[in-house]
A protein has these predicted regions:
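Generic secondary-structure boundary signal with a strong preference for alpha-helix termini
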Residues: 27, 31, 127-130
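Cell-wall polysaccharide-cleaving catalytic domain and substrate-binding groove, primarily
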Residues: 36-195, 200-327
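Bacterial Sec-dependent N-terminal signal peptides
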Residues: 1-16, 31-34, 40-46
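Hydrophobic core
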Residues: 20-28
Length: 327
């Protein structure tokens, strides 16, 4: 739900070495495995020690990452991530409609909430988005609101938001994407690559950034935690794959930190839908338990109490144009 963004800082047939190569496939995709197989055939056959899997994990931190795991280069993954976040934020898979969503004032300290990832009037992400929107579309319907967002009436902002979405759609989507790329997508890609995460891990990071915001508060209060706090606390308990750790163990720790953060916020806000806000985390834990590292479709899940099935046909039907400006 659009209620937790924290901007306190800002907001196998593989030959004799099959065990090793299977591990490399799981960690890095077929490209790395093929490279390892080529190298193997250029050497004499050798016996794999009982510690081969452990050695493969250590080698993983020194080898090239699989760029197919990240939204900056894998467009289909980008569409899957936006659909899943859309289900969590707006209970709607088709992200095109979510650019026009308007949740309003939901009773938290963030003011009025609207847009693809829940821009808010009090946290600092709606204003720069509207400033960029003004740059690319001066005189747009929201120009009259951008300099006094903390005092604008909800009804006026809602009407102007709808006008922008209905009548200046391409520019309005481009402006929202500009902010999402800066605050969420680029940060998710950066740290997912740094930690050598899978496609599933990339999605988990992106969802956390949308929900909790970028930056780091260094607060002991879980309610104040941003993405940087969640990641540092998870790393304190488990090594990332780049450090030679197990991805499932690390990401389960990361999701566990999110449970603590969201749970504390729900406890302090009795009107919050606790079950609904935890659905996104339950889904992530289910995919981790399945070891669905490539986030394969179809995906069958519940979000905000609603049942969804996300298929490849649906992804193919969702707009490519909407997400192109994130390149």
């Amino acid at each position: 739900m659009k209620n937790s963004k924290n901007f306190s800082v800002r907001k196998i047939a593989l030959g004799a070495s099959s065990t090793l190569l299977a591990t490399l496939i799981a960690a890095n995709g077929m490209g790395l495995a093929n490279a390892a197989e080529t190298h193997h055939h250029s050497e004499h056959q050798q016996t794999i020690s009982p510690n081969s899997q452990k050695l493969a994990k250590k080698a993983q931190s020194k080898m090239a990452i699989n760029n197919n795991n990240y939204m900056d280069q894998n467009f289909d993954l980008r569409k899957r991530c936006f659909a899943l976040v859309g289900a969590a934020e707006d209970t709607h898979l088709n992200y095109h409609d979510n650019y026009g969503s308007f949740s309003g004032d939901i009773g938290d300290p963030r003011g009025i909430t609207a847009g693809i990832t829940g821009f808010t009037t009090e946290t600092g992400d709606m204003k720069p988005m509207l400033d960029y929107y003004h740059q690319i579309s001066p005189g747009n319907p929201l120009d009259q609101d951008r300099d006094h967002l903390k005092h604008v009436s909800e009804s006026d902002l809602k009407a102007h938001w709808k006008d922008a979405y209905d009548n200046d759609t391409d520019n309005f989507i481009k402006a929202q994407n500009h902010q999402v790329k800066s605050d969420d997508m680029d940060v998710a890609v950066k740290y997912a690559k740094k930690d050598h995460l899978s496609q599933l891990g990339q999605y988990i990071y992106f969802d956390a950034l949308v929900k909790h915001g970028p930056g780091k508060s260094n607060s002991n209060n879980p309610e104040d935690w941003s993405f940087g706090d969640l990641r540092s606390r998870a790393k304190a308990k488990a090594k990332t794959p780049a450090q030679g750790g197990d991805e499932s163990t690390y990401l389960n720790n990361f999701v566990g930190q999110r449970y603590d953060s969201i749970g504390k916020e729900n406890a302090d806000n009795p009107d919050m839908d606790s079950d609904g806000t935890f659905d996104r985390l339950k889904f992530q834990q289910e995919e981790l338990a399945k070891e669905d590292w490539d986030l394969k479709l179809p995906l069958d899940f519940h979000m905000n109490g609603k049942h969804f099935i996300l298929t490849q046909d649906m992804i193919n039907g969702f707009s490519d144009k909407d997400l192109a400006s994130l390149n």
